Amino acid sequence: MPFMTASSPSLLQRLKSLSLVTQILIGLIAGIALALFAPEAAKGTAFIGKVFVSALKAVAPILVFVLVMASIANHKHGQETHIRPILFLYLLGTFAAAVVAVIASMMFPSHLVLSTDNIAVSAPGGISEVLQSLLLSVVDNPVSALMNANFIGILAWAIGMGVAIRHAGDTTREVLGDLSNGVTVIVRVVIRFAPLGIFGLVASTLATSGFGALIGYAHLLAVLLGCMLFVALVMNPLIVFWKLRRNPYPLTLQCLRESGITAFFTRSSAANIPVNLELSKRLGLHEDTYSVSIPLGATINMAGAAITITVLSLAAVHTLGIAVDIPTAILLSVVAAICACGASGVAGGSLLLIPLACSLFGIPSEIAMQVVAVGFIIGVLQDSAETALNSSTDVLFTAAACLGEEQKAQRPA
């Protein structure tokens, strides 16, 4: 039969020939369909999602350690990196996100029905405690840092070892480069399983949680997600345009599509580091720069966390009828930005830093912790959107700074 030739591609071959983003989209649609039509079967797919997230989390610490160490060890004298402008963009973006959240919360105030149930969690006592936590993370034992995915400690040791090995022989540096390439190959294999992992995560999450619990907090969620969308689609492109002086949307949308989607479903900036490193490589960015800025961004570039802290804190303020003047709102933006930068150093992330911001308005800890409880209830969407914004912004600002510096170097003197 002439139409049944050996050259006809099978369904599996056709799927393999599609881009990773398209495969992820198919996995996403399949996960939603399974949760809708066979919820019991969908619950069983949770294991696939857990395996994928665990694999990403397992490979991320060693990848960052080896990649940064190899990058610094093989860095040639006189070769430029663009870390300083990226750091500036990270801080500017986080502060801008906090300002957007303050304005949105003033325009569309949210009111909460605060629960009387107390959650037994411990929040940091002040900004100094968050900063102390970060400093202690820097001087953490290297083995402990790798085991616990303490990326501040991993970065500190990788930079220190890289600087020390720069003075070693060429053979040592070549071995380190080969080791880095080997880890990168493993990462690529893990990322190829993203469509299956996201299928499992989406199907099991929708089947077990659903979105019924979120209906009561629709207004609060609308403000939170609206702020995050505004920052992702308006504020960040404005910052990129200021840096590149050209249409920022092709780059912005590529970062959201290829980094934001996986981050949304894994809900982990650390797990998304390998995805961002791979995207940076495909964009042709400076390896010595992105190998440091991407893991650093996963720790301190927290626009989504700044929005969460600000919106939920001001929701508590509006609920209690506390008046907020402009200077206090500006101070809240600064505090939220600083807290957000320390969110990765606190177990529970941005939600447990809400009492710290609430303390600006004299809100007692008991009430602030009830606001944290609300945060946990809406966490299905809030945490996913926050991580997607945080992680996609890491690679967006890295690309903007690298491309901007390249443009500057090419301009005639």
From Swiss-Prot:
GO molecular function: neutral L-amino acid:sodium symporter activity
Entry GO terms, CC: plasma membrane
Catalytic activities: L-serine(in) + Na(+)(in) = L-serine(out) + Na(+)(out); L-threonine(in) + Na(+)(in) = L-threonine(out) + Na(+)(out)
Cellular localization per UniProt: Cell inner membrane
InterPro entries in the record: Na-dicarboxylate_symporter (IPR001991), Na:dicarbo_symporter_sf (IPR036458), Ser_Thr_transp_SstT (IPR023025)
Membrane-traversing stretches: 18-38, 52-72, 86-106, 119-139, 145-165, 196-216, 221-241, 292-312, 320-340, 360-380
Keywords assigned: Amino-acid transport, Cell inner membrane, Cell membrane, Membrane, Symport, Transmembrane, Transmembrane helix, Transport
Principal localisation: membrane
Biological process annotations from GO: serine transport; threonine transport
Entry keyword annotation includes Cell inner membrane: yes
The UniProt record lists the keyword Transmembrane helix: yes
Membrane topology according to the record: Multi-pass membrane protein
Function noted in UniProt: Involved in the import of serine and threonine into the cell, with the concomitant import of sodium (symport system).
Family: Belongs to the dicarboxylate/amino acid:cation symporter (DAACS) (TC 2.A.23) family.
Protein name per Swiss-Prot or TrEMBL: Serine/threonine transporter SstT
Gene that this polypeptide is encoded by: sstT
